[in-house]
């Protein structure tokens, strides 16, 4: 019997958990309330901060609580172009300006948005990474659904009541700069999680990985593996529908999506 492989150890958590102790908090939209459903609420950008382990900067936005005499600070994913002291408007009747939060159904077709809700009230789940954005393609007023194009290129039908931030996530072009040296990768992943450096399976011994061993580094068996394989064998291309390069014209690929 071989050893417990890396994938099995990761499932147990422990040293493989995300490094979250030093992070600034969960970046989400406001809880949806009466003010956002029927009008708008005004907030002000107090600060733009770096969140360790995240490529995009965060914005601290202060709102007056509509129900109590107090102020609430929310952490938003910063849209490119916002600045400290800027007013942010959230709600159905807010204007279509960079950084404002509106329901997708009120936006014209072709609007570029980020931090988009997947389901109404989930406070932003899609297009959140630095430089990412989704595009509003079309609306169907009868079914109250909207179609959006996600950063992956796939198109998704969502409720028109889903909110989104107008604009592109700040920090774009981050991956254009090459890492160049191992020390930078070390510090990058130290802030994120314990996943670096990653030893290839074919470079291991047979006891440590199903692809290990041999007089030269080769897998020696099909890299595809069935879905119900035991955990110690489930490595490679798990339950792959297809393998290899995407061949053919772009139009064919779009039809598949």
Curated annotation (Swiss-Prot):
Per the UniProt entry, what is one GO biological process? cytoplasmic translation
InterPro entries of this UniProt entry? NA-bd_OB-fold (IPR012340), Rib_uL2_dom2 (IPR014722), Ribosomal_uL2 (IPR002171), Ribosomal_uL2_arc_euk (IPR023672), Ribosomal_uL2_C (IPR022669), Ribosomal_uL2_CS (IPR022671), Ribosomal_uL2_dom3 (IPR014726), Ribosomal_uL2_RNA-bd_dom (IPR022666)
Return the GO cellular component terms, semicolon-separated. cytosolic large ribosomal subunit
Region called Disordered, residue ranges: 207-230
Q: What keywords does the record list, in alphabetical order?
A: Cytoplasm, Ribonucleoprotein, Ribosomal protein, RNA-binding, rRNA-binding
- Cross-referenced PROSITE patterns, in alphabetical order? RIBOSOMAL_L2 (PS00467)
Superkingdom of this protein's organism: Eukaryota
> Where in or outside the cell is it found?
Cytoplasm
Q: What is its main location?
A: cytoplasm
A matching Pfam family: Ribosomal_L2
Q: Report the GO molecular function annotations.
A: RNA binding; rRNA binding; structural constituent of ribosome
The UniProt subunit note reads as follows:
Component of the large ribosomal subunit.
Identify its protein family: Belongs to the universal ribosomal protein uL2 family.
UniProt xrefs under NCBIfam families: PRK09612.1 (NF007180)
- Tell me, what does this protein do in biology? Component of the large ribosomal subunit. The ribosome is a large ribonucleoprotein complex responsible for the synthesis of proteins in the cell.
Record protein name field: Large ribosomal subunit protein uL2
